[in-house]
């Protein structure tokens, strides 16, 4: 199982300040604990500011076919928004980010592991369940799982022709992140102080 926990309110409002926001709630699968009441309370506060263009609540956004069908019904409201705020596990955020290529997609939750069955997703996206989601700084691409070295402070310098030096069949995660940030006009995120990975949140050391 895994648990999604809301990021600090200050962290979320710093993302939404001055922006029109479309909100996506994923109630998850049975393997995910979603903070539904806390999320609803925060979203009510955001909506009171008059900047929420719409809210979509569904499940299994990690399934691309299901997610695409749901999003199409809300596309006009999504296009009005400057930012799409996703309340889900890290896999769900990455799925939405891949589909909405021209939009800034941000995670409202951190994901933590709980011993036991981890659920099934039909996608290649991976969430390390690190409890300190980096997706808001990296354009919706997880540096922990997209980089074979799990670097969080940028490219190692060993990639060649866009491929990882550890696995020549693997695309460099940080080159993917750079391209994604450039596409959405967020290269400034690379200038943010590095969010040092706290390994004490990892399942292996608990």
Residue spans of the language-model regions?
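Short, well-ordered alpha-helical microsegments
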Residues: 92-95
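N-terminal glycine-rich "phosphate-gripper" loop used for MgATP/nucleotide binding
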Residues: 86-90
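Iron-sulfur (Fe-S) cluster-binding modules
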Residues: 1-62, 71-84, 97-137, 141-206
């Amino acid at each position: 199982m895994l648990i999604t926990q809301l990021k600090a309110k200050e962290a979320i409002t710093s993302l939404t300040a001055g922006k029109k926001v479309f909100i996506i709630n994923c109630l998850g699968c049975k393997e995910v604990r979603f903070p539904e009441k806390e999320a609803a309370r925060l979203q009510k506060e955001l909506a009171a500011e008059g900047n929420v263009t719409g809210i979509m609540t569904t499940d299994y956004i990690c399934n691309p076919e299901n997610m695409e069908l749901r999003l199409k019904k809300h596309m006009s409201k999504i296009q009005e928004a400057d930012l799409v705020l996703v309340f889900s596990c890290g896999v769900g955020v990455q799925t939405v980010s891949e589909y909405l290529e021209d939009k800034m997609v941000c995670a409202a939750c951190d994901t933590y592991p709980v011993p036991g069955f981890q659920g099934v997703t039909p996608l290649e996206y991976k969430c390390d369940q690190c409890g300190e989601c980096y997706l808001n700084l990296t354009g919706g691409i997880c540096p922990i799982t997209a980089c074979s070295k799990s670097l969080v402070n940028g490219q190692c310098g060993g990639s060649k022709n866009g491929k990882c030096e550890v696995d020549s069949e693997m695309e460099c995660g940080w080159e993917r992140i750079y391209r994604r940030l450039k596409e959405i006009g967020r290269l400034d995120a690379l200038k943010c102080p590095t969010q040092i990975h706290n390994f004490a949140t990892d399942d292996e050391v608990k």
